[in-house]
Curated annotation (Swiss-Prot):
Pfam family, one: CD225
Classification lineage: Eukaryota, Metazoa, Chordata, Craniata, Vertebrata
Entry similarity comment: Belongs to the CD225/Dispanin family.
Gene this protein is translated from: SYNDIG1
Chain positions with Phosphoserine modification: S137
Quaternary assembly: Homodimer. Interacts with GRIA1 and GRIA2.
Membrane listed as a keyword: yes
Keywords: Cell membrane, Cell projection, Endosome, Membrane, Phosphoprotein, Postsynaptic cell membrane, Signal-anchor, Synapse, Transmembrane, Transmembrane helix
Recorded GO CC terms: cell body; dendritic shaft; dendritic spine; early endosome membrane; excitatory synapse; glutamatergic synapse; intracellular membrane-bounded organelle; plasma membrane
Protein name: Synapse differentiation-inducing gene protein 1
KW Transmembrane (keyword) present: yes
Membrane topology note: Single-pass type II membrane protein
Compartments in which it is found: Cell membrane; Early endosome membrane; Postsynaptic density membrane; Synapse
Length: 258
Protein backbone atom coordinates (compact mmCIF):
# COMPACT_ATOMS: atom_id res chain seq x y z
CA UNK A 1 0.00 0.00 0.00
CA UNK A 2 2.81 2.41 0.85
CA UNK A 3 4.51 1.68 -2.45
CA UNK A 4 1.38 2.53 -4.42
CA UNK A 5 1.05 5.87 -2.60
CA UNK A 6 4.70 6.74 -3.27
CA UNK A 7 4.26 5.94 -6.97
CA UNK A 8 1.21 8.25 -7.16
CA UNK A 9 3.11 11.10 -5.52
CA UNK A 10 6.01 10.63 -7.92
CA UNK A 11 3.60 10.78 -10.88
CA UNK A 12 2.12 14.02 -9.55
CA UNK A 13 5.59 15.57 -9.20
CA UNK A 14 6.60 14.48 -12.70
CA UNK A 15 3.43 15.97 -14.25
CA UNK A 16 4.01 19.28 -12.51
CA UNK A 17 7.66 19.36 -13.62
CA UNK A 18 6.67 18.60 -17.24
CA UNK A 19 4.17 21.47 -17.18
CA UNK A 20 6.89 23.80 -15.88
CA UNK A 21 9.25 22.84 -18.69
CA UNK A 22 6.64 23.72 -21.30
CA UNK A 23 6.17 27.21 -19.80
CA UNK A 24 9.34 29.28 -20.30
CA UNK A 25 8.23 32.21 -18.14
CA UNK A 26 8.36 30.31 -14.86
CA UNK A 27 10.82 28.03 -13.11
CA UNK A 28 11.35 25.05 -15.43
CA UNK A 29 13.10 22.93 -12.85
CA UNK A 30 10.51 22.71 -10.15
CA UNK A 31 7.30 24.50 -9.42
CA UNK A 32 7.66 23.95 -5.67
CA UNK A 33 10.52 24.79 -3.38
CA UNK A 34 10.66 22.78 -0.22
CA UNK A 35 11.37 24.85 2.86
CA UNK A 36 11.46 24.21 6.55
CA UNK A 37 7.70 24.63 6.87
CA UNK A 38 6.83 22.59 3.83
CA UNK A 39 6.11 23.20 0.15
CA UNK A 40 6.17 26.87 -0.91
CA UNK A 41 4.81 28.30 -4.18
CA UNK A 42 7.29 29.92 -6.57
CA UNK A 43 4.70 32.11 -8.32
CA UNK A 44 5.52 35.71 -7.22
CA UNK A 45 2.78 37.51 -9.13
CA UNK A 46 -0.87 37.75 -8.09
CA UNK A 47 -2.07 36.46 -11.47
CA UNK A 48 -1.31 32.94 -10.23
CA UNK A 49 -3.68 33.19 -7.30
CA UNK A 50 -5.52 30.06 -8.35
CA UNK A 51 -2.35 27.95 -8.19
CA UNK A 52 -2.01 26.90 -4.62
CA UNK A 53 0.45 24.14 -4.08
CA UNK A 54 0.37 22.24 -0.82
CA UNK A 55 -0.15 18.86 0.67
CA UNK A 56 -3.66 18.65 -0.77
CA UNK A 57 -2.33 16.84 -3.84
CA UNK A 58 -1.11 14.06 -1.61
CA UNK A 59 -3.60 11.99 0.32
CA UNK A 60 -3.91 12.44 4.05
CA UNK A 61 -2.75 8.89 4.55
CA UNK A 62 0.67 9.82 3.14
CA UNK A 63 1.14 12.50 5.86
CA UNK A 64 0.18 10.15 8.61
CA UNK A 65 2.43 7.41 7.26
CA UNK A 66 5.51 9.66 6.97
CA UNK A 67 4.87 11.29 10.35
CA UNK A 68 5.99 14.68 8.99
CA UNK A 69 4.84 18.01 10.49
CA UNK A 70 1.62 19.59 9.21
CA UNK A 71 2.27 21.56 5.99
CA UNK A 72 0.71 25.01 5.56
CA UNK A 73 -0.98 26.36 2.42
CA UNK A 74 0.54 29.50 0.88
CA UNK A 75 -1.79 32.35 -0.16
CA UNK A 76 -0.09 34.68 -2.71
CA UNK A 77 -2.43 37.54 -1.78
CA UNK A 78 -1.25 37.74 1.79
CA UNK A 79 2.39 37.46 0.73
CA UNK A 80 2.13 40.36 -1.74
CA UNK A 81 0.33 42.59 0.79
CA UNK A 82 2.84 41.87 3.52
CA UNK A 83 5.75 42.83 1.27
CA UNK A 84 4.08 46.00 -0.05
CA UNK A 85 3.20 47.13 3.46
CA UNK A 86 6.89 47.44 4.35
CA UNK A 87 8.56 48.37 1.06
CA UNK A 88 7.55 50.26 -2.02
CA UNK A 89 7.21 48.23 -5.23
CA UNK A 90 9.90 48.23 -7.91
CA UNK A 91 12.65 49.26 -5.46
CA UNK A 92 15.79 47.18 -4.96
CA UNK A 93 16.97 47.35 -1.35
CA UNK A 94 20.58 46.89 -0.33
CA UNK A 95 22.21 46.98 3.04
CA UNK A 96 24.41 49.88 4.13
CA UNK A 97 27.49 47.69 4.12
CA UNK A 98 27.01 46.76 0.47
CA UNK A 99 26.44 50.37 -0.54
CA UNK A 100 29.51 51.53 1.40
CA UNK A 101 31.69 48.90 -0.24
CA UNK A 102 30.43 49.89 -3.66
CA UNK A 103 31.11 53.56 -2.96
CA UNK A 104 34.69 52.85 -1.89
CA UNK A 105 35.32 50.73 -4.97
CA UNK A 106 33.85 53.18 -7.46
CA UNK A 107 35.51 56.28 -5.96
CA UNK A 108 38.92 55.22 -7.21
CA UNK A 109 37.69 54.84 -10.80
CA UNK A 110 35.64 58.05 -10.99
CA UNK A 111 36.86 61.33 -12.41
CA UNK A 112 35.30 64.74 -11.97
CA UNK A 113 34.70 67.03 -14.94
CA UNK A 114 34.46 70.78 -14.36
CA UNK A 115 33.00 73.12 -16.96
CA UNK A 116 34.36 76.70 -16.90
CA UNK A 117 32.50 79.36 -18.85
CA UNK A 118 34.30 81.95 -20.95
CA UNK A 119 35.09 85.22 -19.29
CA UNK A 120 32.57 87.82 -20.32
CA UNK A 121 32.11 91.38 -19.11
CA UNK A 122 29.35 92.01 -16.66
CA UNK A 123 26.70 94.63 -17.04
CA UNK A 124 28.75 97.12 -14.95
CA UNK A 125 32.06 96.58 -16.77
CA UNK A 126 33.51 97.54 -20.14
CA UNK A 127 35.87 95.38 -22.19
CA UNK A 128 38.87 96.92 -23.96
CA UNK A 129 40.67 95.41 -26.96
CA UNK A 130 43.57 94.19 -24.78
CA UNK A 131 41.21 91.98 -22.78
CA UNK A 132 41.07 94.16 -19.66
CA UNK A 133 37.90 95.20 -17.96
CA UNK A 134 37.04 98.46 -16.32
CA UNK A 135 34.30 98.72 -13.77
CA UNK A 136 31.70 101.42 -14.23
CA UNK A 137 29.76 102.78 -11.31
CA UNK A 138 26.12 103.78 -11.42
CA UNK A 139 27.06 107.48 -11.55
CA UNK A 140 29.24 107.01 -14.64
CA UNK A 141 26.50 105.32 -16.61
CA UNK A 142 24.28 107.86 -18.36
CA UNK A 143 21.15 106.83 -20.15
CA UNK A 144 19.73 109.36 -22.56
CA UNK A 145 15.97 109.29 -22.54
CA UNK A 146 13.36 111.21 -24.46
CA UNK A 147 9.89 111.76 -23.10
CA UNK A 148 6.95 113.88 -24.18
CA UNK A 149 3.36 114.31 -23.17
CA UNK A 150 0.35 113.36 -25.20
CA UNK A 151 -0.93 116.93 -25.16
CA UNK A 152 2.31 118.17 -26.71
CA UNK A 153 1.99 115.55 -29.40
CA UNK A 154 -1.55 116.71 -30.17
CA UNK A 155 -0.39 120.34 -30.35
CA UNK A 156 2.46 119.30 -32.61
CA UNK A 157 0.01 117.52 -34.89
CA UNK A 158 -2.20 120.62 -35.03
CA UNK A 159 0.78 122.85 -35.88
CA UNK A 160 1.90 120.40 -38.50
CA UNK A 161 -1.56 120.34 -40.07
CA UNK A 162 -1.69 124.18 -40.09
CA UNK A 163 1.76 124.39 -41.64
CA UNK A 164 0.85 121.84 -44.28
CA UNK A 165 -2.35 123.76 -45.14
CA UNK A 166 -0.38 127.03 -45.42
CA UNK A 167 2.22 125.47 -47.67
CA UNK A 168 -0.50 123.95 -49.85
CA UNK A 169 -2.22 127.34 -50.20
CA UNK A 170 1.09 129.01 -51.08
CA UNK A 171 1.80 126.35 -53.66
CA UNK A 172 -1.65 126.81 -55.15
CA UNK A 173 -1.16 130.59 -55.21
CA UNK A 174 2.16 130.23 -56.99
CA UNK A 175 0.70 127.84 -59.50
CA UNK A 176 -2.16 130.24 -60.34
CA UNK A 177 -1.51 132.74 -63.17
CA UNK A 178 -1.14 136.41 -62.09
CA UNK A 179 -4.29 138.55 -62.21
CA UNK A 180 -4.42 141.69 -64.33
CA UNK A 181 -6.70 143.71 -61.96
CA UNK A 182 -8.33 145.30 -65.00
CA UNK A 183 -11.57 146.29 -63.27
CA UNK A 184 -9.82 147.99 -60.37
CA UNK A 185 -7.53 149.92 -62.72
CA UNK A 186 -10.48 151.13 -64.83
CA UNK A 187 -12.31 152.36 -61.71
CA UNK A 188 -9.24 154.18 -60.46
CA UNK A 189 -8.79 155.81 -63.89
CA UNK A 190 -12.38 157.06 -64.24
CA UNK A 191 -13.48 157.81 -60.70
CA UNK A 192 -10.28 158.53 -58.79
CA UNK A 193 -6.91 160.13 -59.50
CA UNK A 194 -6.89 159.53 -63.23
CA UNK A 195 -3.11 159.78 -63.97
CA UNK A 196 -2.37 156.83 -61.66
CA UNK A 197 -5.47 155.04 -62.97
CA UNK A 198 -4.16 155.28 -66.55
CA UNK A 199 -0.80 153.80 -65.45
CA UNK A 200 -2.56 150.94 -63.64
CA UNK A 201 -4.65 150.23 -66.73
CA UNK A 202 -1.50 150.06 -68.89
CA UNK A 203 0.23 147.62 -66.48
CA UNK A 204 -2.82 145.36 -66.39
CA UNK A 205 -2.68 145.18 -70.17
CA UNK A 206 1.02 144.24 -70.01
CA UNK A 207 0.15 141.49 -67.52
CA UNK A 208 -2.22 139.87 -69.99
CA UNK A 209 0.46 139.94 -72.72
CA UNK A 210 3.05 138.28 -70.40
CA UNK A 211 0.61 135.52 -69.45
CA UNK A 212 -0.13 134.87 -73.12
CA UNK A 213 3.61 134.57 -73.82
CA UNK A 214 4.14 132.28 -70.81
CA UNK A 215 6.45 134.65 -68.97
CA UNK A 216 5.02 134.26 -65.50
CA UNK A 217 7.76 136.29 -63.81
CA UNK A 218 7.07 139.39 -65.94
CA UNK A 219 3.33 138.87 -65.59
CA UNK A 220 3.51 138.72 -61.78
CA UNK A 221 5.66 141.88 -61.68
CA UNK A 222 3.24 143.83 -63.89
CA UNK A 223 0.28 142.58 -61.88
CA UNK A 224 1.76 143.77 -58.58
CA UNK A 225 2.57 147.20 -60.02
CA UNK A 226 -0.92 147.59 -61.51
CA UNK A 227 -2.49 146.67 -58.16
CA UNK A 228 -0.29 149.16 -56.28
CA UNK A 229 -1.05 152.04 -58.68
CA UNK A 230 -4.78 151.32 -58.67
CA UNK A 231 -4.92 151.31 -54.85
CA UNK A 232 -2.83 154.49 -54.69
CA UNK A 233 -5.09 156.18 -57.26
CA UNK A 234 -8.19 155.24 -55.26
CA UNK A 235 -6.62 156.51 -52.03
CA UNK A 236 -5.60 159.85 -53.54
CA UNK A 237 -8.94 160.24 -55.27
CA UNK A 238 -10.80 159.51 -52.04
CA UNK A 239 -8.67 162.10 -50.22
CA UNK A 240 -9.34 164.69 -52.94
CA UNK A 241 -13.05 164.06 -52.77
CA UNK A 242 -13.11 164.36 -48.98
CA UNK A 243 -11.08 167.57 -49.08
CA UNK A 244 -13.29 169.13 -51.72
CA UNK A 245 -16.40 168.21 -49.72
CA UNK A 246 -15.01 169.75 -46.52
CA UNK A 247 -14.02 172.96 -48.32
CA UNK A 248 -17.43 173.24 -49.93
CA UNK A 249 -19.21 172.78 -46.62
CA UNK A 250 -17.01 175.42 -44.97
CA UNK A 251 -17.60 177.88 -47.76
CA UNK A 252 -21.36 177.43 -47.65
CA UNK A 253 -21.43 177.81 -43.88
CA UNK A 254 -19.61 181.17 -44.13
CA UNK A 255 -22.07 182.48 -46.70
CA UNK A 256 -25.02 181.56 -44.51
CA UNK A 257 -23.61 183.57 -41.60
CA UNK A 258 -23.17 186.60 -43.76
Amino acid sequence: MDGIIEQKSMLVHSKISDAGKRNGLINTRNLMAESRDGLVSVYPAPQYQSHRVGASTVPASLDSSRSEPMQQLLDPNTLQQSVESRYRPNIILYSEGVLRSWGDGVAADCCETTFIEDRSPTKDSLEYPDGKFIDLSADDIKIHTLSYDVEEEEEFQELESDYSSDTESEDNFLMMPPRDHLGLSVFSMLCCFWPLGIAAFYLSHETNKAVAKGDLHQASTSSRRALFLAVLSITIGTGVYVGVAVALIAYLSKNNHL
